Every structure is written in C-alpha cells, then in structure tokens.
C-alpha cells in the first residue's frame, strides 16, 4: 500500500505530530509513506523515520497561484501513484480535489477542528471517507453538513505509549528543572499550550490565587511558546500576576520540549480553553502519565476525562470552580496509563485508520 498525507506545514502542533507519528508507524508496517507539505521544523523527521517528504506549497490561500499549484500537485500525485490520499486541512483538500479530478485516487479527510461553517470548509466532506478526531467533531459536521453516518469514522488521536510512560521518567531532567525554577516541595499545577487568549490563562491565574489559600506552596506552571503577535497578551498576564501578588507562584516556561517530563513533575494539569478542543491531546498525554486533568466542559476532552476518576470539568471562565477542583484533585488515584493504552493508543489509531483505507 502507498499512502500520501497532505498537510499545510510541518511545524510543531498536534496535527503535525499526528502526521509524523502515522508516517513512522506506516513505515514499520512496510507501507510506502509520503507526506506533502510546505515544510517546517518536522519535515526532516519524515525522512529520518523512513518516509518521503515532498516539499510543495499546499499552504498558501492565494487564489492567484492556485491553478499553477493544482497542476504541480497533479504531477506529483501522478508520479507517486498512491492508493490513498489523506488530507488534513482545507487548503490541501481543495488543491487535492482539483488535482485528483482525472486521477480518481481515493481520498480520506480528517476533520481536526471546529472549522467555520460554510462552502470553504465543506471540502472536507467531499472525501470518500471522513475521519473525526472526537464525537464532538462528528456531531458538529453532521449538524452543519448532514454528512452521511456511514461515511464517518471517529478515530481519536493516538498517544505514544513509549514516550508518555510514567516508567520512563527522566529523573535528572526533573531534578534540574525543579532546582532551576525552585519547585522542590511545591504543588505544581501545569497548563500546556501556546500563550493565546483562547487558552484563558487569566482564569488559570485567578484559580491559583484561590487555591493558594489552602495550598500555600502551590505553583502555576504555564508551558508554551509565545508568537510575536501575542506579546501584548503575555504582558497583560504578567501585569495580572503582579496585581494579584503571585510573582512567586506563577512560572512561564516558553518551550514545549520534554513535555512528557513536565507532565511527570506536575501534580495536576489544567486545560482552561475558551474554545472547545477538537480532541485534547495534552489531556490524554497527561492522564497517560497518571496525572489528573481539569478541563473546561466542552469539546473532545469529554471523550477522555472520566469525572471524579481521572479528572474534573469546570465551566469556561469559572476560576472558583477550577480552584475547588484543584483542591479535590489531590485525592484522585488511578491507572491513567492503562486507561489510555486501552482507549487512545497510537496502535489503535493506526489500526483503525488502515481499516478506513482498506474499506474504500
């Protein structure tokens, strides 16, 4: 079998990581794997893992170059001659739609998010099979596009059970990290994700203030990069921290490397997103490391968290409810690794994706 995945870019992100992981697993199974993208930080990993990265602009929304790019993509697809084209985003889906007109290769799309409703987004439903990363996404596209039930398969994102394994903790990294940020004997409440308004870090910070009344040694750890256009938002968060006298209780770590070790050193992980997450990869990864997760009560995370067992939900913007759940999280004991292994493994994602391909 020969598979082509098409994605706008290969920079760091949940969708991109999923493409890299599938490429690696395809190769292990003897499948010829190709990834077409405009490139990025992760493009070399495709080739290192035994796949084939083809650099081509499937990212730009410029309609004036679209015709030229459709012709170029058609030539690439004819040369590769794949059994399946798997599109991961709307621009690639439109380019593939026109490039594939005379090639008639079977197309699979994965809907990764709650995209704006309209003609532009409807392209994802034109594929021969549609994969949704959560039941929330499935309900969303069925509501807005009336997509046929037998065309849709829900396949949650797969978690790398070797990387996110509580038995594979890097004690040296954790010891050095705790020493650098003075986290020894602290109750660490982490939140992972780019610093943007959608992550609602204001609510996270206010909840730390409330939790501090009962947990004096609490520390909020915000982990994620900051784009240049979000610098003002970061400044506003730092002003809020100063205003609430939390400068010794909130830490920013602007890198997403060694994220599995960040989960390992945390006591609880928070997802305070204002916008529903399509799946909630960070939630599943945290639980896999046996860490409770508290998340806003919407989106794909509702498929992952079992309330009062491995985490809790709170309403968007409710810092008091979040703080109360932080306190309650101290009593939770569970086998998160076993739960994720059974329900959200990379193997499960791979096997079910291949099943979709073979049924076309």
Description of each model-found segment:
Residues 35, 292-295:
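Short hydrophobic beta-strand element within catalytic cores of glycosyltransferases
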Residues 4, 183-199, 205-208, 221:
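Conserved donor-binding/catalytic core segment of Leloir-type glycosyltransferases
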Residues 77, 255-256, 262-266, 281:
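Short alpha-helical donor nucleotide-sugar binding micro-motif in glycosyltransferases
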Residues 101-135, 139, 146:
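A conserved, positively charged/aromatic
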Residues 229-234, 247-256, 262, 313:
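Active-site donor-binding acidic/aromatic loop of nucleotide-activated sugar
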Residues 87-93, 111:
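Short His-centered aromatic/hydrophobic patch
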Residues 306-308, 312-319, 326-331:
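Conserved acidic donor-binding segment of nucleotide-sugar-dependent glycosyltransferases
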Residues 321, 328-346, 352-355:
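A short, well-ordered alpha-helix in the C-terminal region of glycosyltransferases
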